[in-house]
From Swiss-Prot:
Protein name (database record): Large ribosomal subunit protein uL13
InterPro entries reported for this sequence: Ribosomal_uL13, Ribosomal_uL13_bac-type, Ribosomal_uL13_sf
GO biological process, one term: translation
Organism placement in taxonomy: Bacteria, Pseudomonadati, Pseudomonadota, Alphaproteobacteria, Hyphomicrobiales
Keyword Ribonucleoprotein found: yes
GO molecular function annotations of the record: mRNA binding; structural constituent of ribosome
Lineage top rank: taxon: Bacteria
SUPFAM superfamilies, sorted: Ribosomal protein L13 (SSF52161)
Subunit field text: Part of the 50S ribosomal subunit.
Annotated function: This protein is one of the early assembly proteins of the 50S ribosomal subunit, although it is not seen to bind rRNA by itself. It is important during the early stages of 50S assembly.
Annotated GO CC locations: cytosolic large ribosomal subunit
Family: Belongs to the universal ribosomal protein uL13 family.
Amino acid sequence: MATFSQKPAEVEKKWVIIDAEGLVVGRLASIIAMRLRGKHKATFTPHVDDGDNVIVINADKVVFTGKKYSDKVYYWHTGYAGGIKERTARQIIEGRFPERVLEKAVERMVPRGPLGRRQMKNLRVYAGSNHPHEAQQPVALDVAALNKKNVRSA
């Protein structure tokens, strides 16, 4: 029996919606990255974009474990000499674009390259509970029910 290799024309993408309220960032990002890549499907092919379209709502209500909320630091460089910048997870979540914490976590779990960039375009993250994708009839994915450690008990 030959190894199965999916063709791009045979790919069937589903729409999945995830409510991120109270979910742990890293665990949620891992599940989202797996969905975006298509590794949850039996038809997974490494060089084909056969993952699902993922919508995440309430991304501003994700939680960190331990002291990461105040201690985790995100770095970037402006390109100028001495231009290293940093911001904590707390500053980002309380700032203007809190959904970037989750986007960055998922981005770092997806392979870098042309295919990874195309798969990241299938991710839509919204800080609030509203999203413009009702017409796609997304199926709800209950991440909290998959494992009790996915939810932070306060």
